[in-house]
Amino acid sequence: MGLSFSMGLLHVLGAIAGVVSHQCYFRRGEHHLYPFTYVRWYAFIITSTTVVVSFVGGVSLYDSAKATGGWTVTYFVGLYISLLLYRVHFHPLHGFPGPYGARISGLWFSMGLRDRPAFQKLQELHNQYGPIVRVGPSELSIVYPEAVGIIYGHQSRCSKSTFYDNGHPMGSLHSYRHRADHDQRRRTWSTGFGDRALRGYETRVREYRQKLFTRLNDAVGLTVNISDWFNFYSYDVMGDLAFGRSFNMLDTHSNHWAIQVLLDGIVLYKYYVPSWILRCFVTLPSLSKNWHRFVEFTTQKLVHRMNDKVEIPDICASLLAPLNGRSPTTDELNLLMGDSMLVVTAGSDTTATALTSVVYELARHPEEVDVLRAELLAIDADANGEYLHDQISKLPHLNGFINETLRLHPPVPSIIPRKTPADGIHVNGKHIPGGMTVFCPQWVIGRSEAAFMAPLSFNPERWYKYPDLIKDRSAYAPFLTGPYSCIGKPLALMNIRTTMARLIATFDIRFPSGEDGTRLMENAEDHFSMGIERMPVVLTKRR
């Protein structure tokens, strides 16, 4: 009876320990960076307890393991009962609407993305539950137009969420979570995106755009997957601007192996799994093998670039300038690698998606092509059909067309997570508690009647001729807004404008028979940035 009583007490104490560990530790602060540390600690505690109980109690290791195992089970039962009760009934977000499963686990949202992209899922949830939806235990999706400025704007008190720690310890401008660190690094980047630097990039980019149009001219009259060519083009451009050397994808008509490794690796991001799960993939060698291959490749390219002298500065020149010719420290090298990878990934995928979306809308609206061509008549192109960016950057309909395309097809369509300050924030009169993850999905807001009149209609003139069609301009943020906005926006817009102008001047664009592109656009990948794998069109010489 004494042994039975002791075992029962041990199980009770185990359950109590589970509750206490949740209430006093796991529900407070952040614990995502080193998930396997907890596994190792639990394994150590269980093993050492088994040995100690066997030695002190004079029982066999088998009996000791049974007793310790029982205690371990009751510990986790106590921990998860405490966690479930807290998330369902006592969590600060318990009063916000949303699916019941989202209260319990962040994996509920991830499971819902098996057959649809995140931006589609969020649209469905907001249609069902309203402007604020609880999509995870501590996560809210918010589509009130005013929320964009409150969460992302210059006066926002929100910070970056745990999502940005996925590449730790490698850092980058994108991953800095603390405002002071980010602002300091952004000043280094900013020299690479001034007017003088952009004029230099324009010269470098033309070489690759000429290759792109040579390939497109070869495909006149045929069905071509324009998405592939824009991806080849964008990665070649950003490889040149990041490392001084392109990936030669326009020449080989295929993905460079390192880019294919990168694209294969970002598939996991489309499920928006909790940060601790992503950290498992990053920190476990067997799961992160391809990631480390890409990092090693990036390191080699960066070292070559550091030893090169370039006549026309690239983005990397600005990042290397603070070194003044000396070798970087380990921390500086990690930062340079992260920033170089950021140039390639953030500048390529998003620009290719934007250009593909532009072609989609050009094919859907041939009447807009006539307006755009009329606008370009006053501008002289060179012998290759190239327009100087300075001459077209202020064209109202061209810019309106791009704005309208990015409103309906934002390259980063759904989740850009932020963490609310300790005292919380207020959105539309509702208090959102501190320490919560919040985001404003641009794909949903861009189609919201609260932000735009006739939101599903494609009307470039709303941006310069009919301002009443825009109810809240601050809600439009395809490049984000505020201190963490996309620093590469000037380069992206220069590339989009000049490529689009040459497309309009050179080709007529239509969909192949039986295709209108809608299904392909609405079922695009959403892995933080949007990925449009297929967009078949037929290009013919301008009539």
UniProtKB/Swiss-Prot annotation:
Organism equals Aspergillus sp. (strain MF297-2)
What name goes with this protein?
Cytochrome P450 monooxygenase notG
Residues carrying covalently attached carbohydrate according to the record: 225, 403
Please provide, in alphabetical order, the Gene Ontology terms of the cellular component aspect for this entry: membrane
Q: Name one Pfam family in it.
A: p450
Annotated EC:
1.-.-.-
The protein's superkingdom reads Eukaryota
> Which CDD domains does UniProt cross-reference here?
CYP67-like
Gene name in the database record = notG
Sorted alphabetically, the keyword list is: Alkaloid metabolism, Glycoprotein, Heme, Iron, Membrane, Metal-binding, Monooxygenase, Oxidoreductase, Signal, Transmembrane, Transmembrane helix
Point out the signal peptide segment.
Answer: 1-21
